Design a protein with these regions (language model features):
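A conserved SF2-helicase RecA2
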Residues: 157-160, 166-196
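Short beta-strand segments
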Residues: 23, 64-71, 99-105, 127-131, ...
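SF2 helicase motor core recognition
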Residues: 22, 75, 113-116, 127-149, ...
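Conserved helicase ATPase core of P-loop NTP-dependent helicases/translocases
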Residues: 87, 96-131
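Short, solvent-exposed loop/turn segments at secondary-structure junctions
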Residues: 25-32, 70-74, 107-108, 133-135, ...
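Conserved helicase motor "Helicase C" RecA-like lobe of SF1/SF2 P-loop NTPases
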Residues: 71-104
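Soluble or luminal CAZymes and related metallo-dependent hydrolases
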Residues: 14, 39-47, 78, 82, ...
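Interdomain linker/hinge connecting the two RecA-like lobes of the SF2 helicase core
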Residues: 1-73
Length: 196
């Protein structure tokens, strides 16, 4: 109410800042403070559990998965990143590092084309990216078995773009799974209500 009523300096606190902090907290508390512990029942850990289980169950078919996350994109500056955390945990469980890639690593159209080909062949089995980088134009459906929405995008069209990566012609899997991870009593519920 203080923010709405103008009782707070907008350079210190405003609805956009509150909304952004709410999204970060719903994703992982370490985004607000890297010194906080890795909450065992976080949606990041739930995602890692599902990605690993599906990876293990589909080893023989070399099925692939997409993980979408618009916040906390990969960083190489030592700060906490959800992308780095998920990859590290999957590697610790036995997924080869070469099979877990970030779309952000493909900095040119040529590199992106090569990366997409590796996903289509089952050489890369977990591809992580933001809606902007891995939405429209990402045609890797051939072996996709699961898609994971770790956060909620702002626009309904973005959620549709994400789902459109796996639910499309050319996918060899007759049945696919889409997981949406929501942290109870956080900003997640509000965001999903906005986009649906």
């Amino acid at each position: 109410e203080q923010v709405r009523g103008g009782g707070v300096d907008s350079s210190v606190d405003n609805m956009l800042k509150i909304t952004n902090d709410g999204r970060k907290l719903a994703l992982d508390q370490r985004m607000l403070n890297a010194m906080l512990p890795d909450f065992e029942k976080s949606k990041i850990n739930a995602c890692v559990d599902n990605v690993y289980r599906i990876w293990e169950e589909n080893k023989d078919k070399k099925s692939a998965q997409l993980v979408f996350c618009d916040l906390s994109t990969p960083k190489n500056d030592g700060t906490f990143s959800v992308y780095n955390d998920i990859r590290k945990k999957l590697i610790e469980r036995g997924v080869p590092e070469s099979e877990v890639r970030f779309i952000h690593e493909a900095e040119t159209d040529v590199k992106k084309k090569e990366l997409f080909q590796k996903v289509r062949k089952g050489e890369v089995r977990v591809l992580m990216g933001s809606t902007q980088k891995m939405g429209a134009g990402t045609n890797v459906q051939d072996r996709l078995i699961a898609l994971h929405d770790v956060d909620c995008p702002w626009r309904p069209a973005d959620l549709e773009q994400r789902s459109g990566r796996i639910i499309r012609q050319g996918n060899s899997n007759p049945k696919v799974e889409i997981y949406r991870y929501v942290t109870k009593q956080t900003f997640d519920a509000y965001l999903y209500q906005l986009v649906e």
